[in-house]
Structures are given as structure tokens and as C-alpha cells.
Amino acid sequence: IHRGETVALFGKNGAGKSTILKLITGVCFPTSGEITVNGRVSALLELTSGFDPEFTGRENIYLKGQLLGLKNSEIEELEQTIIDFAEIEEYIDQPVRTYSSGMKARLGFSINVNIKPEILIVDEALSVGDEEFKNKCITKVNEIINKEDVTLLFVTHITSTAKEFCKRGIFMKDGKIVYDGNIEETIKKYEGTLKKKK
């Protein structure tokens, strides 16, 4: 996958999509072969992982920012943007353990999309919050990928959403790539296998 490409990964459960995401994000390592990642990765996977429940929302912004490789000065510049996007201003100095799951997810999403990623990985994470916030998230992801140098790797079962974001598609089955091509052709191949099962 090259810099600036927008790629959707398709496949049924167990196809290997999540494993690839874990390899790219460094959550696990390959048992054979190698994977090379060039750029700052922001993963919209488990949005609330890495939060310390006893820390305030503001403290967690710094914690997650540091985990993502940012300096405190960089986080400081982004802090208010993150808070404003998450729409949790009045709760930002309260411990995250007091937040609803939706508030935590919004804060996690906001941190990850506002750190100026070079590689953005999205795994069905655009279902955060109410309809208005979902639309805000979709707009933000579009804004990020419309910058020429940002690479998007998007895992979804919703083909219409994949078409909206991606130009290339990869269809996986049993840990192997079955098809790799433009998004429309990949969707046809993927949907064709779903129809055969019915």
C-alpha cells in the first residue's frame, strides 16, 4: 500500500483483516515475513484503549498523545481542538471513569483524528455517538484523507461506506488476498461470495 492510497479491506469474520491491522499497529508481530510501516499511524480501532480511568479527560489526551509518539508541546497545540471536536468541554477535567461509554469513544476518536496522522486505520469506528456526531466523524475522516499524503486503510462490511472513502479494495479469505483491485470490482467479488452462501 503506497502513501496517499485509500484502501478498503473486505472479508468475512476470520479472514485475517483484524490480524493485519494488529500487525500494522504493532499490537502483534508476524510469525514469518515482515511488515514495514512508514509514517505516524492513527488507528480508530478500540477507541478507549489506553485511557487511565483515574485520569481526567485532559490528562488522558496527554497520555494517549504520548503513546502515539507526540511531544507535550505538540499535544498542547492540539488539546483544545481535541476537546472541541469531542464535545465534552464541561467534563474534560473529570476522571474518565465518570464518562459514559459514548463520551469515552468520542474522546478517543477525537484524539486519533486530530494528531495529524500519515496513516489512518479505521475498523468500523465511524459509528461513534448520535447521527450528528457520526456525520461529523465522516466529514473529519474525509478531510484527513483528502490531504494527498495520508494513507487510509478501512475495514468495513458496509460496501457503500467503503465506496465513499476508498479507491482500491482488497478482498481476503482465510488469511490470503483473493482479489486486489479498484473498489467497484472488489466489491462485486466480495458481494458475489456473499450471494453464493445464501
Question: Each predicted region: which residue ranges?
Answer:
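The feature captures the beta-strand-to-loop junction immediately N-terminal to the Walker
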Residues: 10-12
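Conserved ABC ATPase "signature" C-loop
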Residues: 174-175, 190
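A short, surface-exposed alpha-helical micro-motif characterized by mixed small hydrophobic
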Residues: 162-164
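Conserved ABC ATPase "signature" region
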Residues: 62, 74-91
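ABC ATPase "signature
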Residues: 180-181
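H-loop/switch region of ABC-family ATPase nucleotide-binding domains
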Residues: 156-157
